[in-house]
Amino acid sequence: RTLLNIIKKIKGIILENLLKNAKEAALKLANLDNKTKNEALEAIAKNIEKNKDVIFEKNNLDLTEAKELVKSGKITQSTYNRLKLDENKMRDMIAGIYDVIKLDDPVNKILEKTKLDDNLILEKVSCPIGVICVIFEARPDVIVQIATLAIKSGNAVVLKGGSESINTNKIFEKLINEALNSVKFPKNVINLVFTHDDVNK
């Protein structure tokens, strides 16, 4: 019991540091221009394209375990199908990143403008949220989609995927962060947690 309490305390400290680092990353990310964010997104697309074989290898590990879960009734066949990555899904995923690159910067847009008095104008301007938490199941390609949109909109993100796709989730997080590091992007923008306890905290 004492050992379990120590482990829980250590995990709590690790999670606390992760969230603190994500908040700091969000502040840096909020001030980046569109060109810098697009360069990061392009680096992600290229790194995923370059490492497709590794992604499929990790995905196959998840699929092998998921087959047993389908047999035992712990997950459905439709969940298994969503978990599976193929060339078409990969191509669409990468194309989706380039589609986001083409979008205008959603940050610092004037949404409303009201003249209150002479030389006094009130503006409603779009800004990043900060740190976003997203929970998803089965579809590991969601990591790439959410990470892409988070970066474009100037937000850091904490992701919790389903345990059935843990190997695929981990490789996507690794490749995304590798790409971000290669262009000197702020660290700790994309973060992955693994348990419901982490999310509850």
Locate the predicted segments by residue:
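Extreme N-terminal basic, low-complexity initiation segments
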Residues: 2-6
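Rossmann-like NAD(P) dinucleotide-binding subdomain of oxidoreductase/dehydrogenase enzymes
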Residues: 102, 110-201
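N-terminal Rossmann-like NAD(P)+-binding subdomain of aldehyde/semialdehyde dehydrogenases
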Residues: 7-121
